[in-house]
Amino acid sequence: MAIFMTGDTHGDFSRLRPAAFREQGGLTKDDYLIICGDFGGVWDGSEIEQQWLDWLEDRSFTTLFVSGNHENYDLLRSYPTSVWHGGHVQPIRPSVLHLMRGQLYE
């Protein structure tokens, strides 16, 4: 398992394109990219936002994110919760998960 971290994407995931994030070539869904705050991918439900979320889902790795101060919390609250590695998450897509506050993951 490999773990990569970034933050403050604010809905712009261009830094995750293969040309910029070259390490992703050999990754699998068992490898994680953690976005530490200000994910911005769940903001207004727009078509372009949905396209970016689908694009993230199509990556070879799993995207995890922690909410920051620039999130649409009303929209985030509309997603169902499930348990993942012992803590609660909100699956935005099967491989794009919001790591909820106050949780501990194994």
Question: How would you describe each model-predicted region?
Answer:
Residues 1-4:
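Extreme N-terminal starter segment of soluble prokaryotic enzymes
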Residues 6, 12-105:
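Core catalytic region of metal-dependent phosphoesterases/phosphodiesterases
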